Amino acid sequence: LDFTSGVAVNALGHCHPHLVAALQEQATRLWHMSNLFKSPDGDRLAARLCEQSFADFVFFCNSGAEAMECAIKVARRYHAAKGHPERYRLVTFEGAFHGRTLGTLAATGSAKYLEGFGPPLDGFDQVPHGDLEAVKKAIGPQTAAILIEPVQGEGGVRSAPTAFFKSLRQLCDDNGLLLIFDEVQTGMGRTGDLFAYKRLGVTPDIMSLAKALGGGFPIGACLATAEAASGMTPGSHGSTFGGNPLAIAAANAVLDVMLKPGFFDHVQKMSLLLKQKLASVVDRYPAVLSEVRGEGLLVGVKAVVPSGDLVNALRDEKLLTVGAGDNVVRFLAPLIVNEAEVEQSVQMLDEVTTRPLGRSRPRHSSAKACTLAGSL
């Protein structure tokens, strides 16, 4: 069972028939035309994303890092256009992950990702996650925006109280700042709604998407209100491959499936079942596991033993999971997972916790990885 989903990308499993059909059809029509020209399908995707969110404008790109770079540029350009180019700094949070470009690495602020790449780019002030007083102290005359993930994925599936996010919104309103949500991992249904901000009841000014947006085909998007995007003019940003017809076809197909009635109810139902079952395993093996955390099907199990050993042992049982910070193992099931697959995954976890960890069984080149859409 693949409970990595390509790190929260394959939200509809592997080779979902509707996505396959959409890509096959588009591949016979048009592959690439650059962003010099508009396309009806691209306009439709942008309109659908705006209709389902707070946004008025969408910029298409190819990845989460590119979507985040766009978000950073939009925030800085907004203040420059208002006559305040000195307002370019962003408040970010410890444990965050925003990408691997130089700009997003600086926003991430993690030493292990920055090692060997020289000094980080200027313009980011990192504070402890969930510390409102630290945020207030970090805001100054050069601050442009606050950037945060609704749930930290790479950082260990860590969230913060809803009141904290509401306070961030108020701080932005009081100080003329923009609020940016990095929903690259939390967006597109992963937390039980199309976007995590809806469950928080806190609306950002800018939001980045990627990962599950294309269901496995590379695409990213930066969404913004008309006010936040007011500094962006033709030529101020661009992407050769962003919004190419194949990626647009995949993303529209993903929305076709996700916007059907009952889809997110199913995600929430499977989330509750998975977390309840995982919690029972945690209760039985406190020397191995200590906590279940997360929202929707962005679920983490905090380990007492090294999380890497647990990931390896689960892989030997033919369950694919992925590690995260804070010694957490992420269970990122496809959003179409069923009850039997949830039960099977938890049974596999139960089995590995009963034996010594740290040594993987020999693996053979003929082994197949079982996925939610058959074997690879």
Language model: regions and residue ranges:
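Conserved N-terminal phosphate-binding loop of PLP-dependent enzymes in the Aspartate aminotransferase
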Residues: 1-376
